[in-house]
From Swiss-Prot:
The gene is PEX20. Residues 17-28, 340-361 have a biased composition (Basic and acidic residues). This is Peroxisome biogenesis protein 20. Residues 1-15, 37-47, 323-336 have a biased composition (Polar residues). A motif (WxxxF/Y motif 2) lies at residues 126-130, 411-415. It comes from Yarrowia lipolytica (strain CLIB 122 / E 150). There is a cross-link at C4 (Glycyl cysteine thioester (Cys-Gly) (interchain with G-Cter in ubiquitin)).
């Protein structure tokens, strides 16, 4: 699928590899051209050295002088794997100076992984260790780069990468340890603060409860409280008694005023007509109220036994009124004059114009003429003028009736025959 595209990395690489550069190589002389020495170094010296080293590695023969441990051991062993006094970084025993050994065997014996030895990390001086190790960690990378590049040219491609990876692992380990330690200390401080606050709350609650128990256990305090309660109860009873006495006094005053009014009424009636009201029920009631034999209780009349006498007084008043009415009627009958009987006149005297005794009504027009003439003679006006001002009995009834005054008009217009 990659070859289907217009241009990719594989096609560019194949084009670059298949390009014919034979003419360019022929123009370069092995030893006379200006670039011959450089080409000879690139094609023969470096290539031959790499081939020899590879053959020695395959045959497990002695290493080349450029891979001597004396040249790369101090830099590679001490700078790359850390100083001996650093506990967090891996340590490797340095090789003795001048010792000739197989570089392949030495390389196979290298411990590229992290050391699993015991690490004694103290939380108290982790900041000092980190500050002491930080400058050394920053110096590892340039020293390793210079040492490896100067001592072994063939391993220049992976030497810096290995050094950088080791430095990154060491730095990451220190940072992780620092973060974990910081988190642990923060959590510990938070837990300690929470426990202290919780303990203070518990202590305050305990003190409050203990104080309440002490107050409850104190007999003097309980006695004082009981005395206060008794004093309040006595005060409440005293207030209620005062209120009751005031109510009784008010009732007594009302009954006294009522009795005085009753005595005044009785005395005034006795002075007016003693013989008439002396034995009346009303006068008897007023005397009893004035002598406090009957008192007023709300809307009731109560005797000394506490019985309501309103019904009794009402019945006595009704009987007395009925007897008085009967006495008045009998007295009136005794003093009334006897009726006088008259003989009725004969019918012809009552109705002289009729034989049957029925008197006929006069003609209204004749009555009006006669009445107008009489008024005209008295007032000095003409008869016609009097006719205009004449009111019939019906008109007088309308004027003086309960419906109001009727309008004045000529009777001929209203009663047109």
């Amino acid at each position: 699928m990659a070859s289907c595209g217009p241009s990719n990395a594989l096609q560019n690489l194949s084009k670059h590899a298949s390009a014919d550069r034979s003419l360019q190589h022929d123009r370069m002389a092995p030893g006379g051209a200006p670039g011959a020495q450089r080409q000879q170094f690139r094609s023969q010296t470096q290539g031959g050295q790499l081939n020899n080293e590879f053959q020695q590695f395959a045959q497990a023969g002695p290493a080349h002088n450029s891979f001597e441990q004396s040249q790369m051991g101090p830099h590679f062993g001490q700078q790359h794997f850390g100083q001996p006094h650093q506990p967090q970084m891996g340590q490797h025993a340095p090789m003795a100076h001048g010792q000739q050994s197989d570089w392949a065997q030495s390389f196979s014996q290298l411990n590229l992984g992290p050391q699993t030895g015991p690490q004694h990390t103290q939380q108290s001086n982790w900041g000092q260790d980190f500050m002491r190790q930080s400058p050394q960690s920053h110096q590892v990378q340039p020293q390793m780069a210079n040492g490896v590049m100067g001592s072994m040219s063939g391993m220049s491609s992976f030497g810096p990468m290995y050094s950088n990876s080791q430095l990154m692992n060491s730095t990451y380990g220190l940072q992780t340890e620092h973060q974990q330690t910081h988190k642990t200390e923060t959590k510990s401080s938070q837990d300690a603060a929470f426990e202290a606050a919780f303990g203070a709350v518990e202590e305050s609650i305990t003190k409050t409860s203990d104080k309440g128990k002490e107050v409850e256990k104190d007999p003097m305090e309980q006695t004082y409280r009981y005395d206060q309660a008794d004093a309040l109860n006595r005060q409440a009873e005293h207030i209620s008694d005062n209120i009751s006495r005031e109510e009784v006094d008010i009732k007594t005053d009302e009954n006294g005023e009522f009795a005085s009014i009753a005595r005044q009424i009785a005395s005034s009636l006795e002075e007016a007509d003693k013989s008439k009201f002396e034995k009346s029920t009303f006068m008897n009631l007023m005397r009893r109220i004035g002598n406090h034999e009957v008192t007023l209780d709300g809307d009731k009349l109560v005797n000394k036994e506490g019985e309501d006498i309103r019904e009794e007084v009402r019945d006595e008043l009704l009987r007395e009124g009925a007897s008085q009415e009967n006495g008045f009627q009998s007295e009136a009958q005794q003093t009334a004059p006897l009726p006088v009987h008259h003989e009725a006149p004969p019918p012809e005297q009552i109705h002289p114009h009729t034989e049957t005794g029925d008197k006929q009504l006069e003609d209204p027009m004749v009555y009006i003429e006669q009445e107008a003439a009489r008024r005209a003679a008295e007032s000095g006006r003409t008869v016609e003028e009097e006719k205009l001002n004449f009111y019939s009995p019906f008109e007088y009834a309308q004027k003086l009736g309960p419906q109001g005054v009727a309008k004045q008009s000529n009777w001929e217009e209203d009663y047109d025959f």
